[in-house]
């Protein structure tokens, strides 16, 4: 029998110490990685619950194991809330992550060797959109589109590639693109060549849920997302679709038994909490502020003489090119890290450097907005970053910014008392 008095701190002090250090790092550092956010205590409570003990292969009402009557309730709540949140007729909440959700879509809709048209990783796409190092680029004939000289998707080029290569599926979505996607145009192009339209909204799902970014569900055959990032839930995946019995069956089979075994019901419970949070009125205010903060930060970089890819942002992130400054993304990332500002180096269009070095930074505002930052704080923060970037090897500047970061983090804690 387990004793509830035997806490992690008492049982495994070494592990607990590392976890405490990470908790302190999150409080003391400013998080600007666009794919990161902070979850609520309620989400973490669900994820750390006894639901982790239950195996539940199958779907609600159709399980292979007994004793699933209560996890059925949990999973159905998550399904119903996801459908309500995004206006979908179908939802599968079982994918362990976004990449697994995407893999299920490939397995359901296309066959190995089929042509798939997706956004190039070098231009802002994702590994699972046809990158040569990923299953999507190894198992399928991946054709890639990108952005034009101004940093925008060239839809005429997408159409030209589609007409030339006749893909079975077109992928819309990104990991580093700061503008709004034209889902109607993607749908039009897909229809011209008889392709499925698959939208990966992992980065902007929270914005969609709040109505501050167009909803791809009415346009796409299938939509996937992660449940963290802008959605602010646990790390996991989600598949959505309009009513289509054939596609729904294929998707369910591709997730289980095609790609996964038992679902993580404790994570699914946390997803249900996240969806409930996203249905509240204050979630829309939060997402509106995320975009305002990103716009405010991008404008400071422009005013300070930095090149922002596509000239600004219409979502939660933007890319700063450092080619003109002759700075590498790797060095900029490291210097900002010493100031307790966490960003990620990122390739920019026509980047002369390798993906391990890069010539840019990707900056996102979901996490700082969760802390309570508004435009004033974000403009100030962007100024501090610029101060470091224009004098990268000046440790006195880094030290001064770090003191300011610690002070503002104390004013805006992640988790209050």
Swiss-Prot record:
Any one Gene Ontology cellular component term annotated for this protein: cytosol
GO annotation terms (biological process): glycine biosynthetic process from serine; tetrahydrofolate interconversion
EC number(s) given by UniProt: 2.1.2.1
Gene: glyA
SUPFAM superfamilies xref list: PLP-dependent transferases
InterPro entries to which the protein is assigned, alphabetical: PyrdxlP-dep_Trfase, PyrdxlP-dep_Trfase_major, PyrdxlP-dep_Trfase_small, Ser_HO-MeTrfase, Ser_HO-MeTrfase-like, Ser_HO-MeTrfase_PLP_BS, SHMT-like_dom
Localization per Swiss-Prot or TrEMBL: Cytoplasm
Function: Catalyzes the reversible interconversion of serine and glycine with tetrahydrofolate (THF) serving as the one-carbon carrier. This reaction serves as the major source of one-carbon groups required for the biosynthesis of purines, thymidylate, methionine, and other important biomolecules. Also exhibits THF-independent aldolase activity toward beta-hydroxyamino acids, producing glycine and aldehydes, via a retro-aldol mechanism.
GO molecular function terms noted in the UniProt entry: glycine hydroxymethyltransferase activity; pyridoxal phosphate binding
HAMAP family: SHMT
Catalytic activity from the UniProt record: (6R)-5,10-methylene-5,6,7,8-tetrahydrofolate + glycine + H2O = (6S)-5,6,7,8-tetrahydrofolate + L-serine
Disulfide bonds: none
Protein name: Serine hydroxymethyltransferase
